[in-house]
């Protein structure tokens, strides 16, 4: 049973295209995978990203003087059906899991956009230029809406609340913060063998969830869903592998201080403020994580990537059992002998 999963090659790094990374778009590359695993994991991540991440959406609206969605509002160009359709396009970010109430109040002529929505500190409007309705000079508008958290698509009937005030109209809600996911699989090289997979994943969100966070959430969901199928304990088997000279050098580099990288003062201070002390700590951070570090920019990122590449290392590496207490002890004893 040991060989069933232990001998499969595992991806060693997750790379992020730092130049294109934003609050709404991210491109991620992972390698190497056994042949076929790129498609298996890419398709699984795509489906989870599109269907299972939680987001915020308007679930109902109540309009002053309107009892049902087939009404017209005096002084307003759009009918209620068009207004509801426009409300579905409002992008929101909800801080917390509780539903919140938001409003629009307007008298007289003018164009109402998402920027006119009155919110509290728990709700952010992500597309303030989004058109909602057009008022004439005689218009007197009051819209009361409910924002809630959910996942996937929920039809209006399921958003109906029997305790809601008279005139409340439930709305179809698309909660998913992920708008589009593409993945491609190309060849990856391990030594002289190219019969492995490289997974390239592109994620587009509405801005309420960062693409890198979305990928992390999706991976965690998959992990938790699959955990129930692991109904056996791993057998303990000691495998002694001869460590190559190259692997030994890389291993030693991981335990060196980041101060030995001779970085610029700005980059060194950023690592210090982020409590990154060993090179092994550094390589386990992704490019996206590094860019979130205060005062850490793309110039510092490129500097670090170039230096790590010279050592055969990169950001986004996955290290098992790091740091190893025994290895640290051995290094410390070696320094004391000197």
Curated annotation (Swiss-Prot):
GO terms for molecular function: DNA binding; DNA-directed RNA polymerase activity; protein dimerization activity. GO terms for cellular component: cytoplasm; DNA-directed RNA polymerase complex. Residues 250-338 are annotated as: Alpha C-terminal domain (alpha-CTD). Residues 1-233 are annotated as: Alpha N-terminal domain (alpha-NTD). Keywords: DNA-directed RNA polymerase, Nucleotidyltransferase, Transcription, Transferase. One of its GO terms (biological process) is DNA-templated transcription. The keyword Nucleotidyltransferase applies. InterPro entries: DNA-dir_RNA_pol_insert (IPR011262), DNA-dir_RNA_pol_RpoA/D/Rpb3 (IPR011263), DNA-dir_RpoA (IPR011773), RBP11-like (IPR036603), RNAP_asu_C (IPR011260), RNApol_insert_sf (IPR036643). Pfam families: RNA_pol_A_bac (PF01000), RNA_pol_A_CTD (PF03118), RNA_pol_L (PF01193). The keyword ATP-binding does not apply. It catalyses: RNA(n) + a ribonucleoside 5'-triphosphate = RNA(n+1) + diphosphate. It comes from the Bacteria. Its EC number is 2.7.7.6. Homodimer. The RNAP catalytic core consists of 2 alpha, 1 beta, 1 beta' and 1 omega subunit. When a sigma factor is associated with the core the holoenzyme is formed, which can initiate transcription. DNA-dependent RNA polymerase catalyzes the transcription of DNA into RNA using the four ribonucleoside triphosphates as substrates. The N-terminal domain is essential for RNAP assembly and basal transcription, whereas the C-terminal domain is involved in interaction with transcriptional regulators and with upstream promoter elements. Belongs to the RNA polymerase alpha chain family. This is DNA-directed RNA polymerase subunit alpha.
